[in-house]
Amino acid sequence: MAKNRFLLIIAAVFVVLPAALSLITFYTDWLFFRETGYTQVFTTALAAKVGAGLASGLFMFAFAMVNLYFANRASLPHTPRGVFFEGGNVYRLQRDEMVQMVKPLSILAALVLSLLAGRWGALQWQNLLLFTNGVTVGTSDPIMGKDLGFYLFSLPLLEHVKGFVAFTVLVTGIMVGAVYFFRGGIILSDRGADVDGAVRRHLAILLGIFSLTLATGFYLDAVRLLLAGGNSFHGAGYVDVNARLPLYRILTLATPLAGAVVAFGLWKGAWRLTLIPPIIVAAVYGIGIVGYPAMLQKFKVAPNELALETPYIANSIRFTRLGYDLDKIKTVPFDVELNLSAADIAKNDATIRNIRLWDHGPLLKTYSQLQQIRTYYKFFDVDNDRYLVNGQYTQVMLSPRELSYNDLPSRNWINERLIFTHGNGLAVGPVSRISREGLPEFFIKDIPAVSLADIRVTRPEIYYGELSNDYVIVGTKVPEFSYPTATGNINTTYGGKGGVALDSMLRKALFAARFKTEKILLSSDITDQSRILYYRTVGERVKTVAPFIRFDGDPYLVVADNGTLKWIIDGYTHSSRLPYSKPLRGGINYMRNSVKAVVDAYDGTLDFYISDPDDVMIKVYARIFPGLFKPLSAMSADLRGHIRYPHQFLQVQAAMFATYHMTDPKVFYNRENLWEIPVLGEAPMEPYYTVMKLPGEAREEYILLLPFTPSKRDNLAAWLTARCDGENYGKLLAYTFPRDRLIYGPKQIDARINQDSHISQQLTLWSQRGSQVIRGSMLVIPIEQSLLYVQPLFLAAADKAGLPELRRVIVAYGDEVVMEESLELALQRIFGGKRAPVAGVAAAPEDGKASTGDLAREAMSIFERATNLQRQGDWAGYGEELRKLQQVLKQLAR
């Protein structure tokens, strides 16, 4: 009795309890999908999981049980095997007793394996939906002639089915063999194995079926040759097509024949006949798939590699460019001219005004110290965007002020779940403006939000964000904390439609079980009007609804025209089955930025938009989930004005384009024009957003830009740009520099900065005074047909609490390198003239030259600063001001 009670407890702990928790998670997830309005996605995925799981489990169970039925019913002449029990004693059981033991054990094994098979099959629900809803692409692979839709939508499931059937037959054969062994149908002795005829016939049938799975495997191996990697290119090469592919086709046909011969020999008890076919198949595989291809490669292909591999290299180039959307990149020559003038600088004032001087790292630290307000707020990330500010197209940097539960002064359940429920507002500022103290200027700051430009925030609360990683309960008897003031805390009550109502004891109990706390059930502060908000992290929220989409790791916040805050996060369709396409680390070789997801920061509302309607994979997903995706035209106009080409996707494309811009197989093979992404320090440059006027365009626009250098060289080879605005969104342009001239690259400019005696002296002096010098990102800014190089310098105290201040800006143009207190002064030193301040308050004179009066006033101002520095004993600063004065006097002398 006690033993049975113990077994019941074990079963409850390891079976019933996990099953109950799974059901609770399942039901509360259903409530989440109902809250967000995507129940159709939930039910479609559920139906696919149940269907695939049942089909797999039932197939395994039926196949195993049919075979076990015959194995247990077979009439066998031999005596059953002995069974060893504890103590080392051997008990010889009678046939009926043995059958009574073997039969339930074999059924139990079949049941357990079927459950595992069902779980394994359920994991293939996405492959099942792609298979049943796949479409033709209209492009075929160059070797097999199969439409690419076969690889993208059918092959993943076929590979799984083949592996699953082979596994089912194999484990069933093992179970059947074990049953026959214990029932005495297989006798092992020193003279060998004595196998009963009924056993041989049964195993022969299983062997024949298994040979069919092997043949299917060889067929799929032939198909997968197009996905294999090579030395100089990806996909099937000369040896694969002319040696391995024919052999795989032969093996596909020969393996079932060999299996039939082996099965016949086993059926008849002709043991020698069972050995010859496997040996032949193994020999053909070893010689035809391994040996012969190696010899062909060494003696024929290697001496004539370019001539023989050219068509296959062309295939790899074509399909890799297709896989990463590189075939849509338009290449444009960019002939650099060093004739930029002050008038050109003035004409491109919007470009100059939007050069990003504030780096993400220093700005994040500065925002944290200036705008964090309280320790429990945190700026997690800084993002780039653009707004129309006071009538000017302006690039901004912004960072949400989120709530950090780890930094709450008193961490308890009521504080973390009922009171401190949300972040508040954001900090927004221009990318290039700096105060006299070297600090950023703000368009939006403080709590409550203060707008210093025409960007208004009416709903600053952030319930859903990048740090909102656990549940909260709103609408309780406890007032929510909103923000602190000098006179006390301001409270609020959630008025959104997000969350699931806790309107019954059952729901409270279910969520208490899900989140492993009895407080949800027992708290008197929770009423029937309370709502529980979960899946609050932006990435987790969108991934829960659309797990088949790979989402970007960097969502960004947008202030909508009505003052609400919206998160935008990019989503990617992907596959690892595109023939001839070179894969990324992790296997992906097809990728499209086809989804823009929008999450309301206040109520968690989710919307998914198709940003690349030409992507065949998003077309299939839209067929599978007809209510999930909307056309991009359905997005509100103000949000459409803030979509941007994703930084991470351009990084992927650039990494591939560095090699696959070479479309000539000969050039590709010889790596004659291989590019690299420039490296500064230990890290490669990352794409950066800016506002500029592209060559041949009439106005400035928001773009994403990344330069290239030739392989193992430091000069510039090209720059890749992605357009982000309006009808031009998603268009990619590669501007290539002349190969017969030296165009300075970022690393060369960096070296020239280090070699400049004045700059290096100033950096050394700052370091000796205990300041930490932080060199910002080197930006390459195309203007007209020229290039500017801009790098900000930040100073901070050497301790961790040091506030980074933007104190100098280095600008390089042609052979000149200057360092000044502002971008405006640096440009003025190089190009002369008195241009408009970076803030764009006043316009430059039409002729691009400063008046005599302006220069005289500037000289007087510099002289006064120099005098003050002399009194303070700052001789380095004094010398720098004298250099500036010299430049101004030279301009006066002209």
Curated annotation (Swiss-Prot):
The chain crosses the membrane at residues 6-26, 50-70, 98-118, 162-182, 203-223, 250-270, 275-295. Its main location: membrane. GO terms for cellular component: plasma membrane. Keywords: Cell membrane, Membrane, Transmembrane, Transmembrane helix. Pfam families: UPF0182 (PF03699). It is found in: Cell membrane. It is a multi-pass membrane protein. It comes from the Bacteria. The keyword Transmembrane helix applies. Belongs to the UPF0182 family. This is UPF0182 protein GSU2333. It comes from Geobacter sulfurreducens (strain ATCC 51573 / DSM 12127 / PCA).
